[in-house]
Amino acid sequence: IEMHLHRIEGLAEEYLYFNDDMFPVGHCVQTDFFRDGKGVIGMYRHLLSPNMYKKICRISDQVGRRLAGKRSALTFMRPQHICSPMLKSVCTQVYDSNVPEIRQTAECRSRTEKNLCQYVYLDYMYHKGLIIPEKISNRHFSVALASADRLKDFLKNPDTKLVCINDVKL
């Protein structure tokens, strides 16, 4: 689903993709996420891809690099795990490039380590200079580790703009 949001009729050119574990909790303004026609999000370089999530991130970066006309690299970029600032026209351009990995992901009934994710759009944007690599104000909580009281205290008095409440250890 996340790979197809840009196809929603009437969707704005600049839109935010929120995964089901991301929530705005503080005052946010458009410039937190978009400036001068570019998305704003932290981007991090990784070398190893030991799990399915990181393997998907690696493939998404490889496709984004290739479409941006960049050489492959030993490392890969992973966007900050927070809402994603998307540019509809760029997502459409990448999606319409008809690369095999996009078709294979669309045809797959369940996620595998050979799939892409919506990060392919952010990776392409990054490699084309359409990302301002700046960390978005956020906090992460894992329900596997954080106490209910700690989470409640944060939600009553947040010190960041966004929060990720995840069901896995981050």
Language model features by range: what are they?
Residues 1-12:
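Active-site-proximal specificity loops/subdomain of glycosyltransferases
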Residues 1-2, 22, 114-119:
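Conserved glycosyltransferase catalytic-site signature
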Residues 4, 66, 93-94, 124, ...:
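Residues that form generic nucleotide/phosphate-binding pockets
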Residues 4-5, 106-110, 150-152:
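Generic recognition of flexible, low-complexity loop/linker segments
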Residues 12-25:
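Short beta-strand-to-loop acidic/aromatic patch adjacent to the donor-nucleotide binding site
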Residues 23-27, 32-35, 118, 170:
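Short catalytic/ligand-binding loop motif for oxyanion handling, primarily in non-cytosolic enzymes
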Residues 34-115:
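Long, charge-rich alpha-helical interaction segments
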Residues 112, 117-170:
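Long, low-complexity C-terminal extensions of enzymes
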